[in-house]
């Protein structure tokens, strides 16, 4: 599966965070019982997530803008609920609208933080083996609607993204295209 996502972080002391567009892609392992109303799947996805925000002024009265980007391997385990009964002419499950819901765990494999003041950027790269500011594990709940080869998915993060400081959680909306080979 491959697609685009928009993500943001809810940060407890900052109400000026914005969604930012990025990429997601990976593989799906599906257990589809024949002619059942339920199924299950496990996805392994690469997902770039983050946010941009304005955080006040510096000592010279210049506005400060932050951009946080993080790179995750996410593993959602989803229950598939088929929204109508199978018919004789149904060749495959992709033609039946589906609701997918379940938990997701994410592993931060890197990221960077950019601080921009007066058009000048200062960037800090974070790798998983560094003691950076990102927590390595993220978890949340995922819900999706799928039809044919298109899926719209929302992930509500529940883990704190940063090791220290304000409480912040990931929120991701993605649209993906997938095929079964």
Short names for language-model regions:
Residues 29-33, 81-83, 107, 147, ...:
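Residue-level signature of outer-membrane beta-barrel architecture
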